[in-house]
Amino acid sequence: MAPIIRKSHPLLKIINNSLIDLPSPSNISAWWNFGSLLGICLITQILTGLLLAMHYTADTSLAFSSIAHICRNVQYGWLIRNLHANGASFFFICIYFHIGRGFYYGSYLYKETWNTGIILLLTLMATAFVGYVLPWGQMSFWGATVITNLFSAIPYIGQTLVEWAWGGFSVDNPTLTRFFALHFLLPFLIAGITLIHLTFLHESGSNNPLGIISHCDKIPFHPYFSLKDILGFTLMLIPLLTLTFFSPNLLGDPENFTPANPLVTPPHIKPEWYFLFAYAILRSIPNKLGGVLALAASVLILFLTPLLHKSKQRSMAFRPFSQVLFWLLVANLLILTWVGSQPVEHPFIAIGQMASFTYFLILLVLFPMIGALENKMIY
């Protein structure tokens, strides 16, 4: 019998073992679709970004007008630009759902996979931040100024570090040029880390909603989950295209239609919606260094979740108290997102401080406590 080429060819067998003959748990739900959706988002962003980079000019005097040129004069430039901008939002929607699913079903106990995933999140956040600066509108400029300035809170080397990042004494042409270079580079770094992420995942195999070992009941990835993923792509691309065609600027900031002006500060400086929860945590602490540490902790706290798992059960499927706490955390994050978009005044300051405190309380104290309590109740 002749060898099957997909199983014998050195390159094809890697694809075969990852996407065709991969043994997968038979009961994984739609929550397991977001990994492949993130892959589609990344490919879409790289392709649209490449096309945009062909027409974009990374110079302070030309950047804003080059975006206008793309939207007006380039064939389907408006579509490519809006797909790229809104694709970023969908990227973050998918990654937040993906992390939430990992948190709910205890996937973080695959420590290497989880840790590479957090590194991916941090790289994605960096990519989105430097990308937001490129149109060189008011919010781009002031967002870059405010966020890069946070590094000056680092004792002793802070100010030097900021000026080194800027390439001068303020956000100017060198800053824009290097941000464009970074924005081009980082997505390929994300693609590389994604391969490491998948390598670690395929060492252990996927988790499943019950959080139990599923070696005895595996099914091939193709055709079952390949088809399910295609359905997922369709269900994501429909809202993305709807947003892009009918309301492309819905998630953007009106300030960014004004070219960057270092002499005029916008009334409310705020990042894109997907960073608002972290921005609210940053603002809730009246001390600069404290705020920066809280901002860093809000994401880096994810590294601690495997260490804070005290339950004898992996998944939350049969842990009602932990479920309630999980949805409280989700509601808390939504409140933080809303507060981050509001001006710094009463009552938003107090709400932000309470929500920030609750965020860390739930993750660091209540989850381990409830996990231990459920052990006492069940076992």
Curated annotation (Swiss-Prot):
Cofactor note: Binds 2 heme b groups non-covalently.
Membrane topology: Multi-pass membrane protein
Keywords: Electron transport, Heme, Iron, Membrane, Metal-binding, Mitochondrion, Mitochondrion inner membrane, Respiratory chain, Transmembrane, Transmembrane helix, Transport, Ubiquinone
Residues that, per the record, bind heme b b562: H84, H183
Subunit structure: The cytochrome bc1 complex contains 11 subunits: 3 respiratory subunits (MT-CYB, CYC1 and UQCRFS1), 2 core proteins (UQCRC1 and UQCRC2) and 6 low-molecular weight proteins (UQCRH/QCR6, UQCRB/QCR7, UQCRQ/QCR8, UQCR10/QCR9, UQCR11/QCR10 and a cleavage product of UQCRFS1). This cytochrome bc1 complex then forms a dimer.
Note, other: Heme 1 (or BL or b562) is low-potential and absorbs at about 562 nm, and heme 2 (or BH or b566) is high-potential and absorbs at about 566 nm.
Function statement: Component of the ubiquinol-cytochrome c reductase complex (complex III or cytochrome b-c1 complex) that is part of the mitochondrial respiratory chain. The b-c1 complex mediates electron transfer from ubiquinol to cytochrome c. Contributes to the generation of a proton gradient across the mitochondrial membrane that is then used for ATP synthesis.
Name of this chain's protein: Cytochrome b
Gene field: MT-CYB
